[in-house]
């Protein structure tokens, strides 16, 4: 039962994290994971207001003056080969990466 809840949570996080036009369904995302197509994944990028690419963790967008949350610079590869980075809450980035690793392990065991 716990596994189903974790998979459901991962599904929700992945669906919100992935662009809808890139992946129409979770099944296609899993197929890409199985085939290894995710390594050089490029996405269409949008203009950013909190770009942290140049400074990574030292950028002001990654600092919370009230020290309420920790932020982490999260990057994706754009279609033109350019990297785009934004600051996100550290917990969000780490939870998303845990879900991706979990889904990869499940796919390896099932596939």
Curated annotation (Swiss-Prot):
Expressed by the venom gland. The modification Valine amide is found at residue 110. Disulfide bonds join 45-62, 52-73, 61-87, 75-85, 78-99. Contains 5 disulfide bonds. GO terms for molecular function: toxin activity. Residues 20-43 form a propeptide. A motif (Processing quadruplet motif) lies at residues 40-43. One of its GO terms (cellular component) is extracellular region. It is found in: Secreted. The keyword Secreted applies. Residues 1-19 form the signal peptide. Keywords: Amidation, Disulfide bond, Knottin, Secreted, Signal, Toxin. The presence of a 'disulfide through disulfide knot' structurally defines this protein as a knottin. Insect toxin. Belongs to the neurotoxin 19 (CSTX) family. 11 (latartoxin) subfamily. This is Latartoxin-2b. It comes from Lachesana tarabaevi. The lineage of its organism: Eukaryota, Metazoa, Ecdysozoa, Arthropoda, Chelicerata.
